[in-house]
Design a protein with these regions (language model features):
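Bacterial N-terminal signal peptides that target proteins for export
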Residues: 1-11
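A "functional boundary" signal
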Residues: 22-310
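Bacterial N-terminal signal peptides
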Residues: 9-19
């Protein structure tokens, strides 16, 4: 399972509290101009919310360096306005979305430079959910730079702070981060143990269903690396329950979560040479519209299943 895919999917979705308004449309510039007009003529929370929507529009275009430069300016303006109004919640959101923008541009040094001050801000203002999300991004930056020592140190610090607060969600998030550090080093057994403990804690809290289903996906990947196929199959009932809980909480279907489960089962049956069952899950994957599963992985599976049938 791709480590970086998780980061974009989970943290983009979990951190941002609003959807991109009209991001799929062709009138982005018109929307930006309209929001700038609103910002100019509004005050208070309306002004901050308009900044919030404006930087979301630019975040959909951050692959463009010029748009990223503009986004950084908008972040600065939004931060200044939040400080002027004394709105620490919106100020914290600015910092979080700035870090997400850097992670999605692979700007790991920027994250390592900026995140510590933002984490101090979150601690001071007791914005713990954002604290855990952004601490995860700092750990991510170290992992993707290959600095596993600092990644592990930050994950331990994150866990200790959560444990001190008796915050099970925070402890689970820290364990997730630790497991990812093992994942990128192919330390499968240690990864497995961390994800099992993480999952156990996440079942006791609400609001982290996306991370819970991703933890199951990574756990299956770790078990596959250890050829523990029976253990993968044992996980399936509770994995399905986790996805169902996610869908109920979100109020919509979660095709990516199902896709990760189907990939785990497809690969399990391919590895154990039960190609008929593997084919069933390949068909389910083909039925998921716009799934994010690797085209190479699907092509490989299709070839192996076809070859097995002579």
């Amino acid at each position: 399972m791709k480590y970086k895919t998780y980061l974009v999917t989970v943290l983009w979705g979990a951190l941002l509290s609003l959807t991109l308004p009209g991001a799929a449309q062709n009138n982005l510039q018109h929307q930006k101009d309209s929001l700038r007009q609103v910002i100019e003529h509004s005050e208070g929370i309306d002004k901050l919310r308009s900044y919030h929507r404006l930087y979301y529009l630019y975040m959909s275009e951050i692959a463009d360096d010029r748009k990223m430069d503009t986004l950084l300016t908008v972040f600065d303006q939004a931060e200044a306005e939040a400080i002027r109004q004394g709105n620490t919640k919106m100020q914290g959101m600015v910092y979080g979305n700035l870090i997400i923008s850097h992670i999605n541009r692979n700007e790991y040094d920027q994250i390592i430079q900026k995140a510590p001050a933002y984490l101090d801000f979150y601690i001071k203002h007791e914005q713990w959910r954002l604290y855990y999300q952004i601490h995860m991004q700092l750990i991510t930056a170290y992992n993707l730079k290959g600095d596993y020592t600092h990644a592990a140190e930050e994950a331990q610090l994150m866990f200790d702070r959560a444990k001190e607060r008796k915050d099970k969600a925070g402890m689970a998030t820290a364990l997730y981060a630790t497991a990812i550090t093992y994942n990128v080093q192919d330390r499968w057994k240690e990864e497995e143990d961390c994800f099992r403990e993480c999952i156990s804690l996440l079942w006791e809290v609400s609001g982290y269903d996306n991370i819970l289903t991703q933890a199951y996906a990574f756990l299956c990947s770790s078990l596959r690396a250890q050829a523990q196929y029976d253990e993968i199959l044992k996980l399936v009932p509770e994995y399905r329950k986790a996805i169902a809980r996610f869908e109920k909480a979100a109020g919509r279907e979660q095709p990516e979560a199902w896709g990760n489960l189907y990939v785990a089962l497809m690969n399990t049956y391919i590895d154990t040479k039960d190609y008929d069952k593997a084919g069933e899950y390949l068909a389910k994957l083909d039925g998921i519209v716009n799934n994010n599963i690797s085209k190479y992985e699907l092509a490989r599976a299709r070839a192996l299943i076809f070859q097995s049938r002579g």
